[in-house]
Protein backbone atom coordinates (compact mmCIF):
# COMPACT_ATOMS: atom_id res chain seq x y z
CA UNK A 1 0.00 0.00 0.00
CA UNK A 2 2.78 2.42 0.89
CA UNK A 3 4.59 1.74 -2.38
CA UNK A 4 1.42 2.45 -4.38
CA UNK A 5 1.09 5.78 -2.55
CA UNK A 6 4.77 6.72 -2.94
CA UNK A 7 5.51 5.69 -6.53
CA UNK A 8 2.08 5.76 -8.21
CA UNK A 9 0.40 8.61 -6.37
CA UNK A 10 -2.43 6.48 -5.04
CA UNK A 11 -4.65 7.93 -2.35
CA UNK A 12 -5.06 5.97 0.86
CA UNK A 13 -8.45 4.77 -0.39
CA UNK A 14 -7.03 3.65 -3.74
CA UNK A 15 -4.16 1.86 -2.01
CA UNK A 16 -6.67 0.01 0.14
CA UNK A 17 -8.54 -1.03 -3.02
CA UNK A 18 -5.25 -2.43 -4.30
CA UNK A 19 -4.76 -4.33 -1.04
CA UNK A 20 -8.25 -5.80 -1.31
CA UNK A 21 -7.61 -6.77 -4.92
CA UNK A 22 -4.39 -8.56 -3.98
CA UNK A 23 -6.18 -10.51 -1.24
CA UNK A 24 -9.14 -11.46 -3.43
CA UNK A 25 -9.68 -14.93 -4.87
CA UNK A 26 -10.26 -13.08 -8.16
CA UNK A 27 -6.97 -11.27 -7.71
CA UNK A 28 -5.90 -11.26 -11.37
CA UNK A 29 -9.14 -9.66 -12.61
CA UNK A 30 -9.29 -7.05 -9.87
CA UNK A 31 -5.60 -6.21 -10.26
CA UNK A 32 -6.12 -5.74 -14.00
CA UNK A 33 -8.82 -3.15 -13.27
CA UNK A 34 -6.27 -1.05 -11.33
CA UNK A 35 -3.39 -1.56 -13.75
CA UNK A 36 -3.87 1.52 -15.94
CA UNK A 37 -4.38 3.79 -12.94
CA UNK A 38 -1.14 2.44 -11.47
CA UNK A 39 0.81 3.01 -14.71
CA UNK A 40 -0.61 6.53 -15.06
CA UNK A 41 0.57 7.29 -11.53
CA UNK A 42 4.02 5.87 -12.25
CA UNK A 43 4.32 7.96 -15.42
CA UNK A 44 3.38 11.09 -13.50
CA UNK A 45 6.37 10.39 -11.26
CA UNK A 46 8.71 9.75 -14.19
CA UNK A 47 8.67 5.96 -13.96
CA UNK A 48 7.98 4.53 -17.42
CA UNK A 49 8.94 1.72 -19.80
CA UNK A 50 10.59 -1.45 -18.55
CA UNK A 51 11.00 -0.05 -15.06
CA UNK A 52 7.27 0.60 -14.73
CA UNK A 53 6.46 -2.86 -16.08
CA UNK A 54 8.91 -4.48 -13.65
CA UNK A 55 7.36 -2.66 -10.68
CA UNK A 56 3.87 -3.80 -11.67
CA UNK A 57 4.93 -7.40 -12.30
CA UNK A 58 6.61 -7.64 -8.92
CA UNK A 59 3.52 -6.21 -7.25
CA UNK A 60 1.18 -8.54 -9.15
CA UNK A 61 3.33 -11.57 -8.36
CA UNK A 62 3.34 -10.64 -4.67
CA UNK A 63 -0.45 -10.96 -4.75
CA UNK A 64 0.01 -14.73 -5.21
CA UNK A 65 1.71 -15.28 -1.88
CA UNK A 66 1.88 -12.06 0.15
CA UNK A 67 0.01 -11.41 3.37
CA UNK A 68 -0.25 -8.53 5.87
CA UNK A 69 2.25 -7.92 8.65
CA UNK A 70 -0.33 -8.92 11.26
CA UNK A 71 -0.59 -12.32 9.58
CA UNK A 72 3.17 -12.69 9.59
CA UNK A 73 3.25 -12.08 13.35
CA UNK A 74 0.66 -14.84 13.86
CA UNK A 75 2.64 -17.13 11.58
CA UNK A 76 5.87 -16.38 13.45
CA UNK A 77 4.18 -17.30 16.73
CA UNK A 78 3.03 -20.63 15.28
CA UNK A 79 6.53 -21.32 13.94
CA UNK A 80 8.08 -20.59 17.34
CA UNK A 81 5.54 -22.72 19.20
CA UNK A 82 5.98 -25.59 16.73
CA UNK A 83 9.77 -25.39 17.02
CA UNK A 84 9.56 -25.43 20.81
CA UNK A 85 7.28 -28.48 20.80
CA UNK A 86 9.45 -30.32 18.28
CA UNK A 87 12.56 -29.64 20.38
CA UNK A 88 11.14 -30.53 23.79
CA UNK A 89 8.39 -33.05 22.91
CA UNK A 90 9.21 -34.50 19.46
CA UNK A 91 7.08 -37.64 19.86
CA UNK A 92 3.95 -35.72 20.92
CA UNK A 93 4.58 -33.20 18.14
CA UNK A 94 4.76 -35.98 15.54
CA UNK A 95 1.64 -37.75 16.85
CA UNK A 96 -0.34 -34.50 16.85
CA UNK A 97 0.59 -33.75 13.24
CA UNK A 98 -0.34 -37.28 12.16
CA UNK A 99 -3.71 -36.93 13.88
CA UNK A 100 -4.35 -33.61 12.10
CA UNK A 101 -4.01 -35.13 8.61
CA UNK A 102 -4.78 -34.31 5.88
CA UNK A 103 -3.07 -30.96 6.30
CA UNK A 104 -0.01 -28.92 5.60
CA UNK A 105 3.05 -29.28 3.48
CA UNK A 106 4.43 -32.66 4.54
CA UNK A 107 2.98 -36.15 4.14
CA UNK A 108 2.69 -38.62 7.05
CA UNK A 109 5.70 -40.49 5.64
CA UNK A 110 7.87 -37.35 5.69
CA UNK A 111 6.66 -36.45 9.19
CA UNK A 112 7.46 -39.88 10.61
CA UNK A 113 10.84 -40.06 8.86
CA UNK A 114 11.75 -36.68 10.34
CA UNK A 115 10.70 -37.88 13.78
CA UNK A 116 12.82 -41.02 13.41
CA UNK A 117 15.82 -38.90 12.40
CA UNK A 118 15.30 -36.95 15.63
CA UNK A 119 15.46 -40.06 17.79
CA UNK A 120 11.73 -40.83 18.07
CA UNK A 121 10.64 -44.47 17.86
CA UNK A 122 7.60 -44.81 15.57
CA UNK A 123 5.74 -48.12 15.72
CA UNK A 124 3.39 -49.66 13.19
CA UNK A 125 -0.31 -50.31 13.98
CA UNK A 126 -1.09 -53.06 16.49
CA UNK A 127 -4.66 -54.28 16.94
CA UNK A 128 -4.41 -54.52 20.74
CA UNK A 129 -1.98 -51.65 21.37
CA UNK A 130 -3.20 -49.00 18.90
CA UNK A 131 -5.98 -46.53 19.45
CA UNK A 132 -8.02 -45.19 16.58
CA UNK A 133 -5.46 -42.40 16.04
CA UNK A 134 -1.75 -42.08 16.74
CA UNK A 135 -0.91 -42.30 20.44
CA UNK A 136 2.13 -42.20 22.72
CA UNK A 137 3.40 -45.21 24.61
CA UNK A 138 6.33 -45.94 26.88
CA UNK A 139 9.58 -46.74 25.14
CA UNK A 140 12.00 -48.96 27.05
CA UNK A 141 14.65 -49.32 24.37
CA UNK A 142 18.19 -49.04 25.78
CA UNK A 143 20.74 -46.60 24.45
CA UNK A 144 22.42 -43.25 25.10
CA UNK A 145 20.25 -40.41 26.33
CA UNK A 146 19.22 -37.09 24.88
CA UNK A 147 21.73 -34.35 24.08
CA UNK A 148 20.09 -30.97 23.48
CA UNK A 149 22.96 -29.97 21.20
CA UNK A 150 22.33 -32.97 18.91
CA UNK A 151 18.91 -32.94 17.17
CA UNK A 152 19.26 -36.65 16.33
CA UNK A 153 18.88 -37.45 20.05
CA UNK A 154 15.91 -35.25 20.96
CA UNK A 155 13.48 -38.16 21.08
CA UNK A 156 15.70 -40.53 23.06
CA UNK A 157 14.41 -41.49 26.46
CA UNK A 158 10.95 -40.17 25.60
CA UNK A 159 7.76 -41.93 24.52
CA UNK A 160 7.30 -43.78 21.24
CA UNK A 161 4.59 -42.99 18.68
CA UNK A 162 2.16 -45.82 17.97
CA UNK A 163 0.29 -45.44 14.68
CA UNK A 164 -3.48 -45.82 14.99
CA UNK A 165 -5.62 -48.39 13.21
CA UNK A 166 -7.30 -45.44 11.50
CA UNK A 167 -4.10 -44.95 9.50
CA UNK A 168 -4.65 -48.28 7.72
CA UNK A 169 -5.95 -48.09 4.17
CA UNK A 170 -9.73 -48.52 3.96
CA UNK A 171 -10.45 -48.41 7.70
CA UNK A 172 -11.58 -44.83 8.29
CA UNK A 173 -12.26 -43.00 11.55
CA UNK A 174 -15.63 -44.54 12.48
CA UNK A 175 -14.48 -48.12 12.00
CA UNK A 176 -11.19 -47.33 13.75
CA UNK A 177 -13.12 -46.07 16.79
CA UNK A 178 -15.18 -49.28 16.83
CA UNK A 179 -12.07 -51.47 16.60
CA UNK A 180 -10.22 -49.53 19.31
CA UNK A 181 -13.23 -49.59 21.66
CA UNK A 182 -13.45 -53.38 21.38
CA UNK A 183 -9.88 -54.09 22.49
CA UNK A 184 -8.46 -56.55 23.40
CA UNK A 185 -8.99 -59.25 20.79
CA UNK A 186 -8.02 -62.89 21.23
CA UNK A 187 -7.18 -63.57 17.59
CA UNK A 188 -8.08 -62.63 14.02
CA UNK A 189 -11.30 -64.65 14.11
CA UNK A 190 -12.37 -62.85 17.31
CA UNK A 191 -12.01 -59.51 15.53
CA UNK A 192 -14.03 -60.77 12.55
CA UNK A 193 -16.86 -61.96 14.82
CA UNK A 194 -17.13 -58.70 16.75
CA UNK A 195 -16.50 -56.06 14.07
CA UNK A 196 -18.01 -56.19 10.60
CA UNK A 197 -15.02 -55.91 8.25
CA UNK A 198 -14.70 -56.62 4.56
CA UNK A 199 -12.07 -58.96 3.17
CA UNK A 200 -10.11 -55.96 1.85
CA UNK A 201 -10.17 -54.27 5.27
CA UNK A 202 -9.02 -57.41 7.06
CA UNK A 203 -6.20 -57.88 4.58
CA UNK A 204 -5.17 -54.22 4.93
CA UNK A 205 -4.86 -54.66 8.69
CA UNK A 206 -2.81 -57.81 8.17
CA UNK A 207 -0.58 -56.14 5.58
CA UNK A 208 0.07 -53.28 8.01
CA UNK A 209 1.30 -55.75 10.63
CA UNK A 210 -1.62 -55.00 12.95
CA UNK A 211 -2.01 -58.70 13.79
CA UNK A 212 1.55 -59.03 15.08
CA UNK A 213 0.09 -58.98 18.60
CA UNK A 214 -1.24 -62.49 18.01
CA UNK A 215 0.95 -65.59 18.22
CA UNK A 216 1.82 -68.38 15.84
CA UNK A 217 1.58 -72.03 16.87
CA UNK A 218 5.13 -71.87 18.25
CA UNK A 219 4.34 -68.84 20.40
CA UNK A 220 6.21 -66.33 18.23
CA UNK A 221 4.50 -63.20 16.82
CA UNK A 222 2.21 -64.06 13.91
CA UNK A 223 4.13 -63.41 10.65
CA UNK A 224 2.52 -61.00 8.22
CA UNK A 225 2.21 -63.44 5.33
CA UNK A 226 0.34 -65.94 7.50
CA UNK A 227 -1.80 -63.14 8.90
CA UNK A 228 -2.74 -62.04 5.37
CA UNK A 229 -3.63 -65.64 4.49
CA UNK A 230 -5.86 -65.99 7.57
CA UNK A 231 -7.41 -62.52 7.28
CA UNK A 232 -9.28 -63.26 4.06
CA UNK A 233 -10.82 -66.40 5.50
CA UNK A 234 -11.60 -64.71 8.82
CA UNK A 235 -13.55 -61.99 7.02
CA UNK A 236 -15.95 -64.69 5.81
CA UNK A 237 -16.34 -66.10 9.33
CA UNK A 238 -18.43 -63.25 10.71
CA UNK A 239 -21.07 -63.31 13.42
CA UNK A 240 -23.63 -64.70 10.96
CA UNK A 241 -21.59 -67.88 10.26
CA UNK A 242 -21.51 -71.06 12.31
CA UNK A 243 -18.15 -71.83 13.91
CA UNK A 244 -16.03 -74.23 11.89
CA UNK A 245 -17.76 -73.81 8.53
CA UNK A 246 -15.13 -71.46 7.07
CA UNK A 247 -11.84 -73.05 6.06
CA UNK A 248 -8.44 -71.38 5.69
CA UNK A 249 -8.22 -69.70 9.09
CA UNK A 250 -5.12 -71.72 9.95
CA UNK A 251 -2.45 -70.56 7.53
CA UNK A 252 0.31 -72.91 6.37
CA UNK A 253 3.91 -72.17 7.28
CA UNK A 254 5.03 -69.40 4.94
CA UNK A 255 8.38 -67.65 4.53
CA UNK A 256 8.62 -64.45 6.53
CA UNK A 257 8.95 -61.01 4.97
CA UNK A 258 12.37 -59.40 4.91
CA UNK A 259 12.86 -55.74 5.87
CA UNK A 260 12.35 -54.48 2.32
CA UNK A 261 9.12 -56.46 1.90
CA UNK A 262 7.81 -55.18 5.23
CA UNK A 263 8.66 -51.61 4.18
CA UNK A 264 6.71 -52.07 0.93
CA UNK A 265 3.80 -53.55 2.90
CA UNK A 266 3.84 -50.62 5.33
CA UNK A 267 3.83 -48.06 2.51
CA UNK A 268 1.00 -49.85 0.72
CA UNK A 269 -1.20 -50.23 3.78
CA UNK A 270 -0.57 -47.01 5.74
CA UNK A 271 1.62 -44.79 3.54
CA UNK A 272 4.20 -44.82 6.34
CA UNK A 273 7.29 -47.03 6.66
CA UNK A 274 8.87 -45.95 9.96
CA UNK A 275 11.48 -48.71 9.97
CA UNK A 276 12.69 -48.46 6.40
CA UNK A 277 12.80 -45.50 4.03
CA UNK A 278 12.68 -46.77 0.41
CA UNK A 279 16.12 -45.41 -0.49
CA UNK A 280 17.71 -47.22 2.45
CA UNK A 281 17.42 -50.50 0.56
CA UNK A 282 19.13 -49.03 -2.52
CA UNK A 283 21.98 -47.36 -0.66
CA UNK A 284 24.70 -49.86 -1.61
CA UNK A 285 23.86 -49.44 -5.30
CA UNK A 286 23.53 -45.65 -4.96
CA UNK A 287 26.88 -45.45 -3.18
CA UNK A 288 28.47 -47.42 -6.00
CA UNK A 289 27.18 -44.81 -8.47
CA UNK A 290 28.50 -41.92 -6.39
CA UNK A 291 25.10 -40.75 -5.16
CA UNK A 292 25.37 -38.63 -2.00
CA UNK A 293 22.92 -38.70 0.88
CA UNK A 294 21.18 -35.50 1.94
CA UNK A 295 23.30 -35.38 5.09
CA UNK A 296 26.59 -35.93 3.23
CA UNK A 297 25.98 -32.84 1.07
CA UNK A 298 26.89 -30.64 4.05
CA UNK A 299 30.53 -31.67 3.62
CA UNK A 300 30.64 -31.10 -0.16
CA UNK A 301 32.13 -27.77 -1.31
CA UNK A 302 30.08 -25.08 -3.03
CA UNK A 303 30.01 -25.47 -6.82
CA UNK A 304 30.83 -29.18 -6.84
CA UNK A 305 28.99 -31.53 -9.18
CA UNK A 306 26.94 -34.00 -7.14
CA UNK A 307 24.48 -36.84 -7.57
CA UNK A 308 21.46 -37.14 -5.29
CA UNK A 309 18.45 -39.44 -5.26
CA UNK A 310 15.19 -39.74 -3.39
CA UNK A 311 11.42 -39.79 -3.34
CA UNK A 312 9.76 -36.65 -4.73
CA UNK A 313 7.85 -35.01 -1.88
CA UNK A 314 6.99 -31.65 -3.48
CA UNK A 315 6.97 -29.82 -6.79
CA UNK A 316 6.63 -26.02 -6.78
CA UNK A 317 6.65 -23.36 -9.47
CA UNK A 318 5.94 -19.96 -7.84
CA UNK A 319 4.77 -17.15 -10.10
CA UNK A 320 7.70 -15.05 -8.88
CA UNK A 321 10.33 -17.63 -9.91
CA UNK A 322 10.40 -16.76 -13.65
CA UNK A 323 9.58 -20.32 -14.70
CA UNK A 324 12.06 -22.02 -12.36
CA UNK A 325 10.70 -25.18 -10.71
CA UNK A 326 11.67 -26.42 -7.25
CA UNK A 327 11.51 -30.05 -6.15
CA UNK A 328 12.21 -31.70 -2.82
CA UNK A 329 13.74 -35.17 -2.75
CA UNK A 330 13.74 -37.25 0.42
CA UNK A 331 16.19 -40.05 1.19
CA UNK A 332 16.76 -41.96 4.42
CA UNK A 333 18.84 -39.11 5.88
CA UNK A 334 16.76 -36.04 5.03
CA UNK A 335 15.51 -33.67 2.33
CA UNK A 336 17.32 -32.23 -0.69
CA UNK A 337 16.26 -29.02 -2.48
CA UNK A 338 16.57 -29.34 -6.26
CA UNK A 339 16.22 -26.39 -8.66
CA UNK A 340 15.25 -26.84 -12.32
CA UNK A 341 15.73 -24.14 -14.93
CA UNK A 342 13.17 -23.76 -17.71
CA UNK A 343 15.54 -25.52 -20.10
CA UNK A 344 16.18 -28.48 -17.80
CA UNK A 345 12.48 -28.84 -16.99
CA UNK A 346 11.58 -28.79 -20.69
CA UNK A 347 14.22 -31.39 -21.55
CA UNK A 348 13.18 -33.82 -18.81
CA UNK A 349 9.52 -32.84 -18.53
CA UNK A 350 8.09 -36.35 -18.96
CA UNK A 351 10.26 -37.83 -16.19
CA UNK A 352 9.92 -34.85 -13.85
CA UNK A 353 6.15 -34.80 -14.04
CA UNK A 354 5.55 -38.54 -13.72
CA UNK A 355 8.35 -40.19 -11.72
CA UNK A 356 7.70 -40.76 -8.02
CA UNK A 357 11.43 -40.87 -7.28
CA UNK A 358 14.43 -39.38 -9.09
CA UNK A 359 18.18 -39.52 -9.41
CA UNK A 360 19.62 -36.07 -10.17
CA UNK A 361 23.03 -34.81 -11.26
CA UNK A 362 23.73 -31.12 -10.77
CA UNK A 363 25.78 -28.37 -9.16
CA UNK A 364 25.66 -27.86 -5.41
CA UNK A 365 25.03 -24.31 -4.20
CA UNK A 366 25.56 -23.10 -0.63
CA UNK A 367 23.35 -20.08 0.10
CA UNK A 368 24.42 -17.38 2.54
CA UNK A 369 21.86 -18.58 5.10
CA UNK A 370 23.19 -22.14 5.08
CA UNK A 371 20.58 -23.70 2.79
CA UNK A 372 21.85 -26.21 0.22
CA UNK A 373 20.41 -26.40 -3.30
CA UNK A 374 21.25 -28.70 -6.19
CA UNK A 375 20.86 -26.99 -9.58
CA UNK A 376 19.87 -29.89 -11.83
CA UNK A 377 21.62 -30.73 -15.10
CA UNK A 378 20.41 -34.29 -15.67
CA UNK A 379 17.51 -36.35 -14.32
CA UNK A 380 16.54 -40.03 -14.46
CA UNK A 381 13.76 -42.02 -12.76
CA UNK A 382 14.53 -44.05 -9.64
CA UNK A 383 12.55 -47.23 -9.09
CA UNK A 384 11.48 -47.48 -5.45
CA UNK A 385 8.31 -48.21 -3.50
CA UNK A 386 6.47 -44.98 -2.69
CA UNK A 387 3.63 -44.64 -0.20
CA UNK A 388 1.99 -41.43 -1.42
CA UNK A 389 2.03 -39.04 -4.33
CA UNK A 390 4.05 -35.85 -4.08
CA UNK A 391 2.35 -32.66 -2.90
CA UNK A 392 2.54 -30.19 -5.75
CA UNK A 393 1.98 -26.42 -5.50
CA UNK A 394 2.03 -23.42 -7.78
Where are these regions (language model features)?
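Noncatalytic, beta-rich nucleic-acid-contacting surfaces in large DNA/RNA-processing enzymes
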Residues: 1-394
Amino acid sequence: MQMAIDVAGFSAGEADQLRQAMASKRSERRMAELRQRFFDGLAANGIVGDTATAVWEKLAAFANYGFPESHSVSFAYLVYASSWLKHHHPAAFCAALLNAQPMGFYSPQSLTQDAVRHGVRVRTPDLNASGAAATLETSTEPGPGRDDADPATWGRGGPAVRLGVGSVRGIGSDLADEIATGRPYADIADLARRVRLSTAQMESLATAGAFGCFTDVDGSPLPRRQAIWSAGAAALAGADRLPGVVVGLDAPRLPGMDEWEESVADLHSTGVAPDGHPTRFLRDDLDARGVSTATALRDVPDGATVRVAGVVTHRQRPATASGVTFLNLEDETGLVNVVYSIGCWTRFRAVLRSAAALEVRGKLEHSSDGVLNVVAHHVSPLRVAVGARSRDFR
